[in-house]
Amino acid sequence: DDRRSPLEECFQQNDYEEFLEIARNSQLYQESLREDSSYHLSFIESLKSDALFSYEKKFWEADGIHGGKVINDLSLIHDLPKREIQALCYPSIKK
């Protein structure tokens, strides 16, 4: 199958900026802009299985530099510590 997902294309081309553009236009990201505090927990649960966040993790693990901007956005949106969101989504990240 030579039809790759747009996220896989970005990863293969090491194009983190394009990945961010896709991420920020995604339904998950747009839904995260809601201010309903009861939504936070189910939102964070959804991050664990969402393709966006698996690619965010892949970018991070590939070079230790890219990745984390989407998490940073979300920590600001939800007023949650970035470390808390990272720990929930990416247990392997130590920073």
Curated annotation (Swiss-Prot):
Catalysed reaction equations from the record: an L-alpha-amino acid + O2 + H2O = a 2-oxocarboxylate + H2O2 + NH4(+); L-leucine + O2 + H2O = 4-methyl-2-oxopentanoate + H2O2 + NH4(+); L-phenylalanine + O2 + H2O = 3-phenylpyruvate + H2O2 + NH4(+); L-tryptophan + O2 + H2O = indole-3-pyruvate + H2O2 + NH4(+)
Keyword Disulfide bond: yes
Gene Ontology MF: a single term: toxin activity
GO cellular component: extracellular region
Keyword Glycoprotein carried by entry: yes
Highest taxon listed in the record's lineage: Eukaryota
Tissues where this protein is expressed: Expressed by the venom gland.
Post-translational modifications: N-glycosylated.
Required cofactor names: FAD
Keywords on record: Antibiotic, Antimicrobial, Apoptosis, Cytolysis, Disulfide bond, FAD, Flavoprotein, Glycoprotein, Hemolysis, Hemostasis impairing toxin, Oxidoreductase, Platelet aggregation inhibiting toxin, Secreted, Toxin
GO biological process terms, semicolon-separated: apoptotic process; defense response to bacterium; killing of cells of another organism
Subcellular location: Secreted
Catalytic activity, EC: 1.4.3.2
Subunit organization: Homodimer; non-covalently linked.
Family, per entry: Belongs to the flavin monoamine oxidase family. FIG1 subfamily.
Function: Catalyzes an oxidative deamination of predominantly hydrophobic and aromatic L-amino acids, thus producing hydrogen peroxide that may contribute to the diverse toxic effects of this enzyme. Is highly active on L-Met, L-Leu, L-Phe, L-Trp, and L-Arg, and no weakly or no active on L-His, L-Tyr, L-Ile, L-Gln, and L-Lys. Exhibits diverse biological activities, such as antibacterial activity against both Gram-positive (B.subtilis) and Gram-negative (E.coli) bacteria, and inhibition of ADP- or collagen-induced platelet aggregation.
Protein name: L-amino-acid oxidase
